Amino acid sequence: MSFLKFAYRNSWRYYSKSTRHFHKIPIRQFIIPTSIAFYLTQNSFPKQNCLIYNDSLKPDPKGDTFEMGLYVSSENELQEKLKSFRSAKITESRNKLIRYLRIFWFGFNDNIVEPVCTILRFLEISAIFLPLLLLYPISWFGHKLKITDTNITETRGSLIWCQLLRKALELAGPSFIKLGQWAGSRTDIFSHALCHELGKLHSNVTAHSLSFTLEKLSQALKVDKIEDAFDEFNRTPIGVGSIAQVYVGELSQKYIDKYDNIQIGKDGNRWCAIKILHPNVRSQIRRDLKIMKFCADAINWIPTMEWLSLPSEVDQFSILMNIQLDLRIEALNLERFNENFKNSIQVKFPKPFLPLSNRDVMFEEHVYGLSMEKFLSTKKQINDVELCKKVSDPFVDAFLQMLILDDFVHADLHPGNVIIRFVKTNKYGTNIISSELESYRITHDLRKKIEEDQDQDFVGKLKSVLTNYTPQICFIDTGIITELNEKNRINFIALFNALARFDGYRAGELMIERSRTPETAIDKEVFAFKVEKLVDKVKQRTFTLGTVSIGDLLDQMLSMVRSHHVRMESDFVSVVVAILLLEGIGRQLDPNLDLFESSLPILREFGFKREAKSLLKDASTLSMLKIWVGLEVRQLMHLSMKQIYDLVRTDQLCPNY
């Protein structure tokens, strides 16, 4: 600094007043001060962080659950944006005539164009479903047939009609495909045969154009071309759904370093899955929902059909669809799941890239693994219950944590949405010591053997991997979650409490009292006695571990609910269906699975976490603790004295606690 001052003070020596130019300056006197000055200007001021932001979303306090809060906030934002857009369009012109023309056009579009488009769509849907409605009488004819791999029996005509309905729903478009998938889970309303057939629904939607994808990606990433953001981008979608399609790409390190708020995981995985909504899908779904609402209101006028509460069911379905049309909600669901399972080694949810995601595009960490569907298909060839339990145990525990501890349940737990990765942990199972590359290579080798039809080699390799590595259960596609509000949670725990105490009659009464329309239920006492008989049948068993199937119990209850017109809350039914799916997958892996026993560690954690709270102020907590105590007593009744001694010795049972 002193040398710089000296050079500055002596600079007059090289200046000519007559020519007003500097004389030739010695290089030493010029370069060194200039370099110092440049260094100081570069380091005297803090660098500004460069951030990237897309549309953020926060839950609205008016929502009674986390996801409902996000939904309310999303809908309000959509209305505000539409209002602001139209206001800006009207006021941007100073010409009064143009302003009035634009006001006229907006009104004309809302009151003429949109209704006409909806009517045309209604005619299209009528052409698809009206012939099917006329063919319904065929379901009364034909011999009774049993559906393969199930206990469901139906007439041949009914099975044919169900197949035709599935084809019609696929033909009708994304809204009706989603409607069919939703109806397939509602065994409390529709027959088992119909629900089984609707479970086969898949999308026949054609992938949207690559140019549309590139445009949406450029907008989200704030780049002119995607090569500026990706090292590699697979231009062929890996999945095309009824609402969106999914691509895979690797974000460049240069792009990540450019923004301070893009954070990747500790493993450095820059591969991401990108979900992009189809063009014009919102307008089509909006029209379809209006048509469904009209049809539901019409059916509700038919005598004896009020118990279905179809208008309110369509309202719930509309919320479900609109939630899936804002991909930020799915990204925020992922963030919450990651927070809930942040301490888990064997359960993983993809990390969302919230700064890059918006209403139409969602970025999340790409999970490369083996699908649960493929694992279940090879279970018989593995023929080792202990190895299969290494997969089933964390899967069941994860679901029970969602249900009991977090009250935030993944509501679409079919095998296609569960992926298995393989990691190596330390001897205590507390840390992952294998790299992301090692996990990728293991999965890649397994998938390569599947593609090459090397079944024997695949099974042998899989058994070796299961023996030497720890399975990590990964859940994807979290767009639909179930979260019970306070009222529904209390109702669910009260029912579960009655079932755990094997008070069947009380369980039946609760199902009617706390249903949506108690007045429409028929033969209420008969229904309660049926539930009591069902529970007593379970109670009379020896209660050997594995003989009590809560899934069978709930499935039969849903059948009785349907026949007695007991309308359950949709969130409640979603939890029941999730339990059925869980036990269905779990028992394929472990035939001796008992959810009552599996829930004990979670209930213990539930009790210990809340022991510092005032339990008397929380009825749901007290009910859950009663269930815990009851199940602990039930388990102790089956233990030998030696096993009890082992529990005390290992501090799993504390008599003086």
From Swiss-Prot:
Classification via InterPro entries: ABC1_dom, ADCK2_dom, ADCK_kinase, Kinase-like_dom_sf
Keywords attached to this entry: Mitochondrion, Transit peptide
Entry coiled-coil feature ranges: none
CDD domains: ADCK2-like (cd13971)
Protein name as catalogued: ABC1 family protein YPL109C, mitochondrial
GO cellular component, one term: mitochondrial inner membrane
Subcellular location: Mitochondrion
Gene Ontology biological-process entries: mitochondrion organization; phospholipid homeostasis
Pfam families registered for this protein in UniProt: ABC1
Native source species: Saccharomyces cerevisiae (strain ATCC 204508 / S288c)
